[in-house]
């Protein structure tokens, strides 16, 4: 995988102070985004980040099951089991899920980008999207390695099915294209079916989402 690994947030984020009729209160930027029904996935996808995303999706559904949720993605990918946990939650909750790539959506993150509600999947102009086969390492006794090999084949087939479902490509095409890293520009990702539109402003995203509603 190209790049420098998982992006890391600064240890100390500046708080945002809001003034209301009840006085002032402060919150971190992620809480402010959540208030606006935005989930930000800006780290490697693992059990911790997956649980965070799932909890936010379920919370926002309970707050208003009829309003869209946006997931902003800048992630190098990560664990396949963590991917499927987020993916299944996205399909489970009632609100439409708008996905927006800001920077990169690689590997597992590319699947989540594609899994947004049709017509509401976007990427900023200079985004980078990468798809490839899930990877795993076999260790242990020969019988264990055989079990792991079968699991690798199952996982690869499942990812091919997911990408085929959301891109309109055949599973055969997906299998061929993920034999090695396949890197897309934002425009190429749109042509492939991973996203619906390349956008340059929030206003454009809102107009396109309204049009597809």
Curated annotation (Swiss-Prot):
Molecular-function annotations in GO: ATP-dependent peptidase activity; ATPase binding; serine-type endopeptidase activity
The entry's keywords: Cytoplasm, Hydrolase, Protease, Serine protease
Active site per UniProt: 107, 132
CC per GO annotation: cytoplasm; endopeptidase Clp complex
Major localization listed first in the record, in broad terms: cytoplasm
Enzyme class: hydrolase
Annotated EC: 3.4.21.92
Compartment(s) where it occurs, according to its Swiss-Prot or TrEMBL record: Cytoplasm
InterPro entries: ClpP, ClpP/crotonase-like_dom_sf, ClpP/TepA, ClpP_His_AS, ClpP_Ser_AS
GO biological process terms on file: protein quality control for misfolded or incompletely synthesized proteins
Chemical reaction(s) catalysed: Hydrolysis of proteins to small peptides in the presence of ATP and magnesium. alpha-casein is the usual test substrate. In the absence of ATP, only oligopeptides shorter than five residues are hydrolyzed (such as succinyl-Leu-Tyr-|-NHMec, and Leu-Tyr-Leu-|-Tyr-Trp, in which cleavage of the -Tyr-|-Leu- and -Tyr-|-Trp bonds also occurs)
Pfam family, one: CLP_protease
Keyword Calcium: no
Family: Belongs to the peptidase S14 family.
NCBIfam families xref list: PRK00277.1, PRK12553.1
HAMAP family: ClpP (MF_00444)
Function noted in UniProt: Cleaves peptides in various proteins in a process that requires ATP hydrolysis. Has a chymotrypsin-like activity. Plays a major role in the degradation of misfolded proteins.
Subunit structure and binding partners: Fourteen ClpP subunits assemble into 2 heptameric rings which stack back to back to give a disk-like structure with a central cavity, resembling the structure of eukaryotic proteasomes.
Protein's recorded name: ATP-dependent Clp protease proteolytic subunit 3
Gene that encodes it: clpP3
């Amino acid at each position: 995988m190209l790049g420098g690994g998982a992006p890391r947030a600064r240890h100390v984020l500046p708080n945002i102070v809001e003034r209301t009729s009840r006085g002032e209160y402060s919150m971190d930027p992620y809480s402010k985004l959540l208030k606006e029904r935005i989930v930000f996935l800006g780290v490697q996808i693992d059990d911790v980040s997956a649980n965070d995303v799932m909890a936010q999706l379920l919370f926002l559904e309970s707050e208003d099951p009829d309003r869209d949720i946006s997931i902003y993605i800048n992630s190098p990918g990560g664990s396949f089991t963590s991917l499927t946990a987020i993916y299944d939650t996205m399909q489970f909750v009632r609100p439409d899920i708008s996905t927006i790539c800001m920077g990169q959506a690689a590997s597992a993150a590319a699947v989540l980008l594609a899994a947004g509600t049709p017509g509401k999947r976007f990427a900023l102009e200079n985004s980078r999207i990468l798809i490839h086969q899930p990877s795993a390492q076999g260790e242990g006794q020969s019988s264990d390695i055989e079990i792991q090999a079968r699991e690798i084949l199952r996982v690869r087939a499942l990812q091919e099915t997911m990408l085929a479902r959301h891109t309109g490509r055949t599973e055969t095409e997906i299998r061929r294209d993920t034999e090695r890293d396949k890197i897309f520009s934002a425009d190429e990702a749109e042509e492939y079916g991973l996203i619906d539109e390349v956008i340059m402003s929030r206003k454009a995203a809102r107009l396109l989402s309204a049009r597809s509603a």
